[in-house]
């Protein structure tokens, strides 16, 4: 039987004796207790020793408990300072009184009457005071001290180790206790010394221990792949705040304040407000009567106070329109991959927060065909060979479309919405050319790419799944 040098040392230390405490064995071997226990377990796995485990409770004083063991409990110290009686106003000047007064009354050591504290006759030393000198686990006094944070009860595990019949036989047959050599030097090889050295044996039939390095989360890998793809296609990335006022999240995108279109997404509303940007009056006029766009608008009233109210962004289109307002001149190609928030019921296909890819392209002479062509190119590079389009509706685009991709086993899967921004959206910011816009649920793209059936798995803290996921290279 192949044994390591430390396993042999354990067997040798047990020769000629019965069960031996691990502490005694460690002292005899001049080794750390934890190491000896580990080596003994290895011997036990090979049937050479037995281990008997015993768990006992030990009580030890905390730092505060040690202090009171020397000075006395707070109630005893206060009691000793009272000469028969004392006004409560004087007693409370002692810092210990905050702790002691309650215990003095609980132990019936004092009586308080008309603001005077009187010492009672029976103030004998209590069980808790005796236990403070020698706490015994499980006793009422020890439990009381533990509640006061003066005693800590800990479990101590001890081991007894003994040779089995097989272990005793191997030990008596003789053990080579020379240190095994794991690495040979050049001199040992050239001189032939290696032939007489006790070489450490290796099991070549055992798989090595897996080493897990740092890993990028599988979902993040796909987000990075999408980001790199759009960079290759000439896009610029933009960012924005999670918290948006209703003006940018709804009003600037031609969603009326008193219309069901505003309820298309259930929203997380916040108590805070943010100011409206310069030029907000143009949005007001467009909502009320169409402004100078030729539209009739929504009619009715429009409140700037409603526009100031904050929400967690329900879509990243709010970032797109802000970016366009800051960059109104064509040509422009930009995108954002952002977390958005909606009051969804959690199920395998819906979460209250998820990543959305938002993109915009602005240039003269752009038309709807360019938008469809972009999707075919983009999804093709993402590995979806078949793409089709269905008519859609969004308050801020016209015409609107919903792209779908074919997934084996699932059929056609809708991945987002797109269209050309309406004049009511772009005109207030001085934009007079077409703007192609889209928003895609990239969390769903990740889910399809990885073959998942439950969207929640993308965000679970499952380290084994992350380790087992293939590394994706863009």
Curated annotation (Swiss-Prot):
Its EC number is 6.1.1.20. Its cofactor is Mg(2+). It comes from the Archaea. One of its GO terms (biological process) is phenylalanyl-tRNA aminoacylation. PROSITE patterns: AA_TRNA_LIGASE_II. L-phenylalanine binds at residues 317, 356-358, 396, 421. Binds 2 magnesium ions per tetramer. InterPro entries: aa-tRNA-synth_II, aa-tRNA-synth_II/BPL/LPL, Phe-tRNA-synth_IIc_asu, Phe_tRNA_ligase_alpha_bac/arc, Phenylalanyl-tRNA_Synthase. It is found in: Cytoplasm. It catalyses: tRNA(Phe) + L-phenylalanine + ATP = L-phenylalanyl-tRNA(Phe) + AMP + diphosphate + H(+). It holds the Pfam family tRNA-synt_2d. Mg(2+) binds at residue 398. Disulfide bonds: none annotated. The keyword Transferase does not apply. The keyword Magnesium applies. One of its GO terms (cellular component) is cytoplasm. It is an enzyme of class 6 (ligase). Its main location: cytoplasm. GO terms for molecular function: ATP binding; magnesium ion binding; phenylalanine-tRNA ligase activity; tRNA binding. Keywords: Aminoacyl-tRNA synthetase, ATP-binding, Cytoplasm, Ligase, Magnesium, Metal-binding, Nucleotide-binding, Protein biosynthesis. Belongs to the class-II aminoacyl-tRNA synthetase family. Phe-tRNA synthetase alpha subunit type 2 subfamily. Tetramer of two alpha and two beta subunits. NCBIfam families: pheS, PRK04172.1. This is Phenylalanine--tRNA ligase alpha subunit. The gene is pheS.
């Amino acid at each position: 039987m192949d044994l390591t040098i430390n396993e042999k040392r354990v067997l040798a230390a047990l020769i000629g004796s019965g069960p031996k405490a691990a502490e005694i064995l460690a002292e005899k071997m001049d080794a750390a207790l934890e190491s000896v226990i580990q080596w003994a377990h290895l011997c036990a796995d090979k049937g050479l020793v037995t281990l008997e485990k015993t768990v006992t409770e030990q009580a030890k004083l905390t730092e505060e408990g040690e202090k009171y063991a020397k000075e006395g409990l707070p109630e005893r110290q206060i009691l000793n300072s009272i000469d028969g009686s004392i006004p409560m106003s004087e007693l409370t000047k002692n810092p210990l009184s905050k702790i002691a007064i309650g215990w003095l009354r609980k132990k019936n050591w004092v009586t308080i009457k008309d603001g005077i504290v009187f010492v009672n006759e029976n103030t004998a030393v209590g069980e808790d005071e005796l236990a403070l000198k020698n706490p015994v686990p499980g006793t009422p006094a020890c439990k009381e001290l533990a509640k006061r944070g003066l005693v800590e009860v800990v479990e101590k595990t001890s081991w007894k180790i003994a040779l089995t019949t097989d272990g005793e036989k191997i030990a008596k047959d003789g053990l080579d206790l020379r240190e095994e050599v794991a690495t040979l030097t050049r001199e040992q090889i050239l001189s032939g010394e290696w032939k007489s050295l006790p070489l450490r044996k290796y099991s070549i039939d055992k798989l090595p221990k897996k080493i897990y390095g740092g890993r990028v989360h599988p979902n993040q890998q796909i987000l990075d792949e999408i980001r790199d793809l759009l960079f290759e296609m000439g896009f610029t990335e933009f960012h924005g705040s999670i918290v948006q006022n209703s003006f940018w999240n709804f009003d600037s995108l031609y969603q009326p304040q008193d219309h069901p279109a505003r309820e298309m997404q259930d929203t997380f509303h916040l108590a805070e407000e943010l100011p409206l940007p310069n030029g907000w009056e143009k949005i007001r006029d467009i909502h009320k009567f169409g402004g100078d766009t030729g539209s009739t608008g929504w009619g009715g009233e429009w409140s700037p106070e409603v526009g100031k109210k904050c929400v967690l962004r329900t879509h990243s289109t709010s970032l797109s329109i802000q970016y366009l307002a800051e960059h109104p001149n064509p040509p422009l190609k930009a995108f954002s991959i952002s977390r958005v928030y909606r009051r969804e019921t959690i199920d395998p296909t819906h979460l209250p927060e998820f990543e959305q890819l938002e993109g915009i392209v602005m240039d003269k002479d752009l038309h709807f065909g360019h938008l469809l062509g972009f999707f075919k190119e983009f999804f093709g590079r993402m590995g979806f060979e078949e793409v089709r389009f269905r008519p859609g509706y969004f308050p801020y685009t016209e015409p609107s479309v919903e792209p779908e991709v074919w997934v084996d086993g699932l059929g056609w899967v809708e991945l987002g919405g797109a269209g050309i921004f309406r004049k009511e959206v772009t005109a207030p910011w001085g934009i007079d050319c077409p703007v192609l816009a889209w928003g895609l649920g990239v969390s769903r793209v990740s889910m399809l790419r990885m073959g998942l059936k439950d969207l929640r798995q993308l965000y679970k803290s499952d380290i084994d799944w992350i380790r087992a996921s293939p590394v994706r290279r863009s």
